[in-house]
Protein backbone atom coordinates (compact mmCIF):
# COMPACT_ATOMS: atom_id res chain seq x y z
CA UNK A 1 0.00 0.00 0.00
CA UNK A 2 2.85 2.37 0.81
CA UNK A 3 4.66 1.70 -2.38
CA UNK A 4 1.62 2.48 -4.52
CA UNK A 5 1.16 5.79 -2.66
CA UNK A 6 4.77 6.71 -3.23
CA UNK A 7 4.48 5.86 -6.89
CA UNK A 8 1.41 8.05 -7.25
CA UNK A 9 3.13 10.86 -5.42
CA UNK A 10 6.18 10.55 -7.67
CA UNK A 11 4.01 10.53 -10.78
CA UNK A 12 2.21 13.68 -9.56
CA UNK A 13 5.53 15.36 -8.88
CA UNK A 14 6.76 14.45 -12.33
CA UNK A 15 3.58 15.76 -13.90
CA UNK A 16 3.83 18.98 -11.92
CA UNK A 17 7.48 19.42 -12.93
CA UNK A 18 6.67 18.89 -16.62
CA UNK A 19 3.81 21.41 -16.47
CA UNK A 20 6.03 23.83 -14.65
CA UNK A 21 8.71 23.53 -17.31
CA UNK A 22 6.14 23.96 -20.07
CA UNK A 23 4.83 27.07 -18.35
CA UNK A 24 8.37 28.35 -17.96
CA UNK A 25 9.07 27.82 -21.64
CA UNK A 26 5.80 29.54 -22.57
CA UNK A 27 6.71 32.45 -20.31
CA UNK A 28 10.18 32.61 -21.88
CA UNK A 29 8.67 32.71 -25.37
CA UNK A 30 6.21 35.39 -24.25
CA UNK A 31 9.06 37.40 -22.76
CA UNK A 32 11.08 37.05 -25.97
CA UNK A 33 8.15 38.27 -28.08
CA UNK A 34 7.58 41.16 -25.68
CA UNK A 35 11.23 42.10 -25.91
CA UNK A 36 11.10 41.89 -29.71
CA UNK A 37 8.10 44.19 -29.80
CA UNK A 38 9.80 46.57 -27.41
CA UNK A 39 12.91 46.53 -29.63
CA UNK A 40 10.79 47.18 -32.70
CA UNK A 41 9.07 50.08 -30.96
CA UNK A 42 12.45 51.45 -29.83
CA UNK A 43 13.84 51.12 -33.37
CA UNK A 44 10.82 52.95 -34.76
CA UNK A 45 11.26 55.68 -32.15
CA UNK A 46 14.98 55.88 -32.93
CA UNK A 47 14.29 56.11 -36.67
CA UNK A 48 11.69 58.80 -36.09
CA UNK A 49 14.12 60.73 -33.90
CA UNK A 50 16.91 60.36 -36.49
CA UNK A 51 14.59 61.61 -39.22
CA UNK A 52 13.58 64.51 -37.02
CA UNK A 53 17.23 65.28 -36.29
CA UNK A 54 18.10 65.11 -40.01
CA UNK A 55 15.18 67.34 -40.85
CA UNK A 56 16.29 69.74 -38.11
CA UNK A 57 19.89 69.64 -39.43
CA UNK A 58 18.74 70.33 -42.99
CA UNK A 59 16.58 73.12 -41.77
CA UNK A 60 19.43 74.56 -39.69
CA UNK A 61 21.91 74.18 -42.60
CA UNK A 62 19.53 75.93 -44.97
CA UNK A 63 19.01 78.67 -42.46
CA UNK A 64 22.77 78.86 -41.91
CA UNK A 65 23.34 79.07 -45.69
CA UNK A 66 20.76 81.79 -45.96
CA UNK A 67 22.41 83.58 -43.07
CA UNK A 68 25.83 83.16 -44.66
CA UNK A 69 24.58 84.44 -48.02
CA UNK A 70 23.01 87.39 -46.29
CA UNK A 71 26.25 88.00 -44.40
CA UNK A 72 28.28 87.72 -47.63
CA UNK A 73 25.94 90.10 -49.43
CA UNK A 74 26.27 92.51 -46.54
CA UNK A 75 30.07 92.07 -46.57
CA UNK A 76 30.18 92.65 -50.34
CA UNK A 77 28.06 95.72 -50.02
CA UNK A 78 30.32 96.87 -47.21
CA UNK A 79 33.44 96.03 -49.27
CA UNK A 80 32.14 97.88 -52.32
CA UNK A 81 31.31 100.84 -50.16
CA UNK A 82 34.75 100.61 -48.57
CA UNK A 83 36.40 100.23 -51.98
CA UNK A 84 34.42 103.16 -53.31
CA UNK A 85 35.41 105.20 -50.33
CA UNK A 86 39.03 104.01 -50.70
CA UNK A 87 38.98 104.82 -54.43
CA UNK A 88 37.49 108.20 -53.69
CA UNK A 89 40.11 108.67 -51.01
CA UNK A 90 42.86 107.63 -53.43
CA UNK A 91 41.47 109.96 -56.09
CA UNK A 92 41.41 112.72 -53.56
CA UNK A 93 44.97 111.80 -52.55
CA UNK A 94 46.11 111.70 -56.21
CA UNK A 95 44.32 114.92 -57.01
CA UNK A 96 46.00 116.49 -54.01
CA UNK A 97 49.41 115.27 -55.32
CA UNK A 98 48.73 116.35 -58.93
CA UNK A 99 50.68 119.47 -59.81
CA UNK A 100 48.44 120.25 -62.81
CA UNK A 101 51.40 120.07 -65.22
CA UNK A 102 51.64 117.45 -67.99
CA UNK A 103 54.72 115.47 -69.02
CA UNK A 104 55.18 114.71 -72.71
CA UNK A 105 58.42 113.21 -73.98
CA UNK A 106 60.47 110.14 -74.82
CA UNK A 107 61.22 107.57 -72.11
CA UNK A 108 64.76 106.39 -71.40
CA UNK A 109 64.91 103.33 -69.12
CA UNK A 110 68.08 103.07 -67.01
CA UNK A 111 69.89 99.78 -66.20
CA UNK A 112 68.59 99.95 -62.58
CA UNK A 113 64.94 99.74 -63.72
CA UNK A 114 63.76 103.34 -63.30
CA UNK A 115 63.50 105.82 -66.15
CA UNK A 116 63.29 109.46 -67.21
CA UNK A 117 61.09 111.29 -69.69
CA UNK A 118 63.45 113.29 -71.91
CA UNK A 119 61.99 116.42 -73.40
CA UNK A 120 64.55 118.14 -75.63
CA UNK A 121 66.39 116.41 -78.52
CA UNK A 122 66.02 113.01 -76.75
CA UNK A 123 68.77 113.98 -74.27
CA UNK A 124 69.03 114.62 -70.47
CA UNK A 125 67.97 118.06 -69.27
CA UNK A 126 66.70 120.00 -66.26
CA UNK A 127 63.02 119.41 -67.10
CA UNK A 128 63.25 115.59 -67.16
CA UNK A 129 60.53 113.64 -65.31
CA UNK A 130 61.27 110.56 -63.17
CA UNK A 131 59.33 107.33 -63.91
CA UNK A 132 59.22 104.64 -61.18
CA UNK A 133 60.16 100.96 -61.85
CA UNK A 134 56.63 99.82 -60.85
CA UNK A 135 55.07 101.95 -63.61
CA UNK A 136 57.61 100.63 -66.13
CA UNK A 137 56.85 96.99 -65.20
CA UNK A 138 53.08 97.49 -65.05
CA UNK A 139 52.71 98.93 -68.57
CA UNK A 140 55.68 97.09 -70.16
CA UNK A 141 57.36 100.42 -70.94
CA UNK A 142 60.59 100.49 -72.95
CA UNK A 143 63.18 103.02 -74.03
CA UNK A 144 61.76 105.03 -76.91
CA UNK A 145 58.13 105.17 -75.75
CA UNK A 146 56.46 108.59 -75.92
CA UNK A 147 54.66 109.07 -72.59
CA UNK A 148 51.94 111.55 -71.70
CA UNK A 149 50.97 111.83 -68.04
CA UNK A 150 50.45 114.00 -65.00
CA UNK A 151 53.36 115.22 -62.90
CA UNK A 152 53.41 114.95 -59.11
CA UNK A 153 54.06 118.01 -56.97
CA UNK A 154 57.81 118.40 -56.55
CA UNK A 155 59.19 118.57 -53.01
CA UNK A 156 62.20 120.58 -51.90
CA UNK A 157 64.50 117.55 -51.62
CA UNK A 158 63.64 116.12 -55.06
CA UNK A 159 65.93 116.97 -57.97
CA UNK A 160 63.46 115.84 -60.66
CA UNK A 161 59.68 115.92 -60.92
CA UNK A 162 58.01 112.48 -60.81
CA UNK A 163 55.31 110.98 -63.03
CA UNK A 164 52.06 110.54 -61.08
CA UNK A 165 50.12 108.41 -63.57
CA UNK A 166 50.34 107.53 -67.28
CA UNK A 167 47.61 108.75 -69.63
CA UNK A 168 48.91 107.41 -72.96
CA UNK A 169 51.84 105.46 -74.44
CA UNK A 170 52.71 106.37 -78.05
CA UNK A 171 49.19 107.76 -78.42
CA UNK A 172 47.53 104.52 -77.23
CA UNK A 173 45.96 103.52 -73.93
CA UNK A 174 48.58 102.23 -71.44
CA UNK A 175 47.11 98.70 -71.16
CA UNK A 176 46.87 98.39 -74.98
CA UNK A 177 50.54 99.30 -75.25
CA UNK A 178 51.45 96.60 -72.70
CA UNK A 179 50.13 93.83 -75.03
CA UNK A 180 52.29 94.70 -78.07
CA UNK A 181 54.85 92.30 -79.58
CA UNK A 182 58.59 92.91 -79.29
CA UNK A 183 60.34 94.31 -82.38
CA UNK A 184 62.71 91.33 -82.47
CA UNK A 185 59.77 88.85 -82.56
CA UNK A 186 58.29 90.35 -85.76
CA UNK A 187 58.91 88.64 -89.13
CA UNK A 188 61.05 90.59 -91.67
CA UNK A 189 60.16 90.35 -95.39
CA UNK A 190 61.30 92.06 -98.62
CA UNK A 191 59.96 95.59 -99.23
CA UNK A 192 56.82 95.16 -101.38
CA UNK A 193 55.13 98.57 -101.16
CA UNK A 194 56.67 101.55 -102.86
CA UNK A 195 57.20 104.95 -101.26
CA UNK A 196 56.49 107.39 -104.10
CA UNK A 197 58.84 110.37 -104.12
CA UNK A 198 57.35 111.99 -107.24
CA UNK A 199 55.10 114.96 -106.47
CA UNK A 200 53.77 117.91 -108.44
CA UNK A 201 56.67 120.21 -109.37
CA UNK A 202 59.02 117.65 -107.78
CA UNK A 203 62.76 118.11 -108.35
CA UNK A 204 64.27 115.94 -111.11
CA UNK A 205 66.33 114.04 -108.54
CA UNK A 206 63.17 112.65 -106.87
CA UNK A 207 61.70 111.54 -110.19
CA UNK A 208 64.97 109.82 -111.08
CA UNK A 209 65.30 108.05 -107.72
CA UNK A 210 61.64 106.98 -107.89
CA UNK A 211 62.23 105.24 -111.22
CA UNK A 212 65.88 104.16 -111.32
CA UNK A 213 66.41 103.27 -107.65
CA UNK A 214 62.93 102.91 -106.07
CA UNK A 215 62.45 102.96 -102.29
CA UNK A 216 59.98 100.61 -100.60
CA UNK A 217 58.64 100.37 -97.07
CA UNK A 218 61.33 98.64 -95.01
CA UNK A 219 64.17 99.49 -97.42
CA UNK A 220 67.74 99.45 -96.13
CA UNK A 221 69.31 101.97 -98.47
CA UNK A 222 72.75 103.53 -98.68
CA UNK A 223 73.55 106.81 -100.41
CA UNK A 224 77.24 106.53 -101.34
CA UNK A 225 78.80 109.93 -101.92
CA UNK A 226 82.06 111.76 -102.20
CA UNK A 227 82.37 115.18 -100.55
CA UNK A 228 80.43 118.07 -102.15
CA UNK A 229 78.17 115.91 -104.32
CA UNK A 230 74.86 117.11 -102.83
CA UNK A 231 74.02 114.23 -100.46
CA UNK A 232 72.55 116.48 -97.74
CA UNK A 233 70.39 118.28 -100.31
CA UNK A 234 69.22 114.91 -101.64
CA UNK A 235 68.27 113.74 -98.11
CA UNK A 236 66.36 116.98 -97.58
CA UNK A 237 64.44 116.48 -100.82
CA UNK A 238 63.63 112.85 -99.92
CA UNK A 239 62.29 113.96 -96.51
CA UNK A 240 60.11 116.64 -98.14
CA UNK A 241 58.74 114.20 -100.73
CA UNK A 242 57.86 111.55 -98.12
CA UNK A 243 56.06 114.09 -95.91
CA UNK A 244 54.12 115.27 -98.99
CA UNK A 245 53.16 111.85 -100.43
CA UNK A 246 52.87 109.93 -97.13
CA UNK A 247 51.71 112.37 -94.42
CA UNK A 248 50.93 109.50 -91.99
CA UNK A 249 54.47 108.10 -92.20
CA UNK A 250 56.84 109.09 -89.39
CA UNK A 251 60.03 110.71 -90.74
CA UNK A 252 63.05 111.13 -88.44
CA UNK A 253 66.09 112.94 -89.84
CA UNK A 254 69.15 112.03 -87.73
CA UNK A 255 72.16 114.30 -88.21
CA UNK A 256 75.40 113.03 -86.64
CA UNK A 257 78.59 115.13 -86.58
CA UNK A 258 76.91 117.71 -88.79
CA UNK A 259 77.51 121.45 -89.14
CA UNK A 260 75.17 123.63 -87.01
CA UNK A 261 74.05 125.77 -89.98
CA UNK A 262 73.10 122.59 -91.90
CA UNK A 263 70.99 121.50 -88.91
CA UNK A 264 69.12 124.82 -88.89
CA UNK A 265 68.57 124.68 -92.65
CA UNK A 266 67.13 121.14 -92.54
CA UNK A 267 64.93 121.90 -89.50
CA UNK A 268 63.43 124.92 -91.27
CA UNK A 269 62.93 123.15 -94.60
CA UNK A 270 61.20 119.98 -93.33
CA UNK A 271 57.69 120.63 -92.03
CA UNK A 272 54.90 118.34 -90.91
CA UNK A 273 53.38 116.89 -87.72
CA UNK A 274 55.12 113.53 -88.28
CA UNK A 275 58.56 114.92 -89.18
CA UNK A 276 61.38 115.29 -86.64
CA UNK A 277 64.97 116.46 -86.90
CA UNK A 278 67.29 115.01 -84.23
CA UNK A 279 70.90 116.15 -84.28
CA UNK A 280 74.29 115.98 -82.64
CA UNK A 281 76.67 118.55 -84.14
CA UNK A 282 80.40 118.04 -84.74
CA UNK A 283 81.34 120.06 -81.62
CA UNK A 284 79.61 117.50 -79.34
CA UNK A 285 81.32 114.56 -77.60
CA UNK A 286 81.22 111.05 -79.17
CA UNK A 287 79.07 109.92 -76.18
CA UNK A 288 76.49 112.47 -77.31
CA UNK A 289 76.46 111.03 -80.85
CA UNK A 290 76.07 107.50 -79.46
CA UNK A 291 73.23 108.36 -77.10
CA UNK A 292 71.23 110.31 -79.69
CA UNK A 293 71.50 107.58 -82.33
CA UNK A 294 70.47 104.83 -79.89
CA UNK A 295 67.46 106.82 -78.67
CA UNK A 296 66.32 107.45 -82.26
CA UNK A 297 66.58 103.74 -83.08
CA UNK A 298 64.60 102.73 -79.98
CA UNK A 299 61.97 105.37 -80.79
CA UNK A 300 61.54 103.95 -84.29
CA UNK A 301 61.29 100.37 -82.97
CA UNK A 302 58.51 101.29 -80.54
CA UNK A 303 56.49 102.83 -83.38
CA UNK A 304 56.97 99.74 -85.58
CA UNK A 305 55.70 97.58 -82.67
CA UNK A 306 52.46 99.58 -83.00
CA UNK A 307 52.36 98.67 -86.74
CA UNK A 308 53.37 102.12 -87.92
CA UNK A 309 55.64 102.98 -90.86
CA UNK A 310 58.83 104.86 -89.95
CA UNK A 311 61.62 106.36 -92.08
CA UNK A 312 65.03 107.29 -90.63
CA UNK A 313 67.29 109.45 -92.80
CA UNK A 314 70.80 109.20 -91.31
CA UNK A 315 73.62 111.56 -92.22
CA UNK A 316 76.04 109.89 -91.95
CA UNK A 317 76.76 106.29 -90.94
CA UNK A 318 80.49 106.87 -91.49
CA UNK A 319 80.62 109.55 -88.80
CA UNK A 320 78.56 107.35 -86.49
CA UNK A 321 81.13 104.55 -86.91
CA UNK A 322 83.92 107.04 -86.16
CA UNK A 323 82.19 108.04 -82.89
CA UNK A 324 81.84 104.39 -81.82
CA UNK A 325 85.49 103.79 -82.73
CA UNK A 326 86.47 106.38 -80.10
CA UNK A 327 84.16 104.89 -77.44
CA UNK A 328 84.70 101.13 -77.83
CA UNK A 329 87.34 99.60 -75.49
CA UNK A 330 90.33 98.40 -77.55
CA UNK A 331 89.81 94.79 -78.68
CA UNK A 332 93.47 94.31 -79.63
CA UNK A 333 92.66 94.06 -83.35
CA UNK A 334 92.78 96.98 -85.76
CA UNK A 335 91.64 97.25 -89.36
CA UNK A 336 93.38 99.50 -91.87
CA UNK A 337 92.85 103.16 -91.09
CA UNK A 338 92.89 102.57 -87.31
CA UNK A 339 89.34 101.16 -87.16
CA UNK A 340 88.57 98.69 -84.37
CA UNK A 341 86.31 95.84 -85.67
CA UNK A 342 84.20 96.06 -82.46
CA UNK A 343 83.30 99.68 -83.34
CA UNK A 344 81.18 98.48 -86.29
CA UNK A 345 78.81 96.36 -84.18
CA UNK A 346 76.40 99.14 -83.11
CA UNK A 347 76.31 100.98 -86.50
CA UNK A 348 75.56 97.61 -88.14
CA UNK A 349 72.82 96.96 -85.58
CA UNK A 350 71.37 100.39 -86.36
CA UNK A 351 71.48 99.89 -90.14
CA UNK A 352 70.31 96.27 -89.91
CA UNK A 353 67.17 97.23 -87.97
CA UNK A 354 65.55 98.41 -91.23
CA UNK A 355 62.95 95.84 -92.29
CA UNK A 356 59.42 95.36 -93.58
CA UNK A 357 57.21 93.40 -91.16
CA UNK A 358 54.72 90.70 -92.18
CA UNK A 359 52.57 91.52 -89.13
CA UNK A 360 52.36 95.18 -90.18
CA UNK A 361 54.60 98.22 -89.86
CA UNK A 362 58.01 98.92 -91.36
CA UNK A 363 61.30 100.64 -90.57
CA UNK A 364 63.04 102.24 -93.56
CA UNK A 365 66.59 103.53 -93.13
CA UNK A 366 68.43 105.59 -95.74
CA UNK A 367 71.99 106.29 -94.59
CA UNK A 368 74.74 108.25 -96.31
CA UNK A 369 78.25 106.77 -96.50
CA UNK A 370 81.30 108.89 -97.29
CA UNK A 371 83.96 107.64 -99.73
CA UNK A 372 87.18 109.09 -101.16
CA UNK A 373 87.52 111.62 -98.36
CA UNK A 374 91.25 111.03 -98.01
CA UNK A 375 90.69 108.93 -94.87
CA UNK A 376 91.33 105.20 -95.15
CA UNK A 377 88.92 104.57 -92.26
CA UNK A 378 85.96 105.96 -94.25
CA UNK A 379 86.66 103.58 -97.14
CA UNK A 380 86.89 100.62 -94.74
CA UNK A 381 83.55 101.58 -93.13
CA UNK A 382 81.91 101.75 -96.57
CA UNK A 383 83.35 98.37 -97.60
CA UNK A 384 82.01 96.81 -94.38
CA UNK A 385 78.50 98.15 -95.06
CA UNK A 386 78.56 97.59 -98.83
CA UNK A 387 76.74 94.24 -98.90
CA UNK A 388 74.35 94.83 -96.00
CA UNK A 389 71.88 97.16 -97.76
CA UNK A 390 69.24 96.25 -100.35
CA UNK A 391 69.32 99.59 -102.19
CA UNK A 392 72.24 101.80 -103.31
CA UNK A 393 72.29 105.30 -104.70
CA UNK A 394 75.78 106.33 -105.83
CA UNK A 395 76.66 110.02 -106.29
CA UNK A 396 79.51 110.92 -108.65
CA UNK A 397 81.92 113.79 -107.98
CA UNK A 398 82.76 114.26 -111.67
CA UNK A 399 79.13 115.08 -112.37
CA UNK A 400 79.02 117.51 -109.43
CA UNK A 401 82.20 119.25 -110.65
CA UNK A 402 80.50 119.76 -114.03
CA UNK A 403 77.53 121.13 -112.09
CA UNK A 404 75.29 118.30 -113.32
CA UNK A 405 72.75 117.81 -110.54
CA UNK A 406 71.54 115.38 -109.31
CA UNK A 407 74.99 113.79 -109.60
CA UNK A 408 73.65 110.21 -109.68
CA UNK A 409 75.73 107.44 -111.23
CA UNK A 410 72.95 105.48 -112.94
CA UNK A 411 75.00 102.39 -113.77
CA UNK A 412 76.08 101.80 -110.16
CA UNK A 413 72.73 102.68 -108.55
CA UNK A 414 69.84 100.27 -108.09
CA UNK A 415 67.50 98.36 -105.78
CA UNK A 416 67.42 94.64 -105.00
CA UNK A 417 64.14 92.91 -105.90
CA UNK A 418 62.96 96.05 -107.68
CA UNK A 419 60.38 93.84 -109.47
CA UNK A 420 58.33 94.00 -106.23
CA UNK A 421 58.22 97.81 -106.42
CA UNK A 422 58.12 98.72 -110.14
CA UNK A 423 55.36 98.00 -112.65
CA UNK A 424 56.22 95.81 -115.67
CA UNK A 425 56.23 98.84 -117.96
CA UNK A 426 58.60 100.77 -115.67
CA UNK A 427 60.84 97.72 -115.28
CA UNK A 428 61.18 97.26 -119.05
CA UNK A 429 62.12 100.92 -119.54
CA UNK A 430 64.70 100.83 -116.71
CA UNK A 431 66.32 97.67 -118.12
CA UNK A 432 66.37 99.17 -121.63
CA UNK A 433 67.96 102.36 -120.25
CA UNK A 434 70.73 100.39 -118.56
CA UNK A 435 71.43 98.48 -121.78
CA UNK A 436 71.53 101.67 -123.86
CA UNK A 437 73.85 103.50 -121.47
CA UNK A 438 76.18 100.60 -120.64
CA UNK A 439 79.04 101.66 -122.93
CA UNK A 440 78.96 105.41 -122.28
CA UNK A 441 80.60 107.51 -119.59
CA UNK A 442 78.63 108.48 -116.44
CA UNK A 443 78.47 112.20 -117.32
CA UNK A 444 77.22 111.50 -120.87
CA UNK A 445 74.54 109.14 -119.51
CA UNK A 446 73.36 111.66 -116.97
CA UNK A 447 73.17 114.49 -119.50
CA UNK A 448 71.07 112.36 -121.88
CA UNK A 449 68.65 111.20 -119.19
CA UNK A 450 68.34 114.70 -117.70
CA UNK A 451 67.32 115.99 -121.13
CA UNK A 452 64.58 113.36 -121.30
CA UNK A 453 63.36 114.19 -117.78
CA UNK A 454 63.36 117.94 -118.47
CA UNK A 455 61.19 117.42 -121.57
CA UNK A 456 58.48 115.70 -119.50
CA UNK A 457 56.31 116.80 -116.56
CA UNK A 458 56.08 113.45 -114.80
CA UNK A 459 57.38 109.88 -114.97
CA UNK A 460 54.40 108.60 -117.01
CA UNK A 461 55.27 111.03 -119.81
CA UNK A 462 58.94 110.08 -119.44
CA UNK A 463 58.11 106.37 -119.91
CA UNK A 464 56.04 107.11 -123.04
CA UNK A 465 58.85 109.29 -124.45
CA UNK A 466 61.45 106.61 -123.74
CA UNK A 467 59.25 103.98 -125.40
CA UNK A 468 59.03 106.06 -128.57
CA UNK A 469 62.78 106.78 -128.66
CA UNK A 470 63.73 103.16 -127.97
CA UNK A 471 61.28 101.88 -130.62
CA UNK A 472 62.83 104.20 -133.21
CA UNK A 473 66.22 102.68 -132.47
Task: Identify what each model region corresponds to.
Residues 201-258, 297:
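P-loop NTPase nucleotide-binding module
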Residues 14, 107-111, 119-121, 133, ...:
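Flexible glycine-/small-residue-rich
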Residues 152-223, 229:
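P-loop NTP-binding catalytic core
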Residues 81-177:
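N-terminal "pre-motor" subdomain/linker immediately upstream of P-loop NTPase catalytic cores
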Residues 144-146, 218, 366:
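Loop/turn positions that initiate beta-strands
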Residues 230, 239-242, 251-273, 277-473:
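P-loop NTPase catalytic core
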Residues 1-100, 122:
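Charged, low-complexity terminal tails
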Residues 95-103, 204-208, 296-301, 350:
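Phosphate-interacting basic helix/loop segments used at nucleotide- and nucleic-acid interfaces
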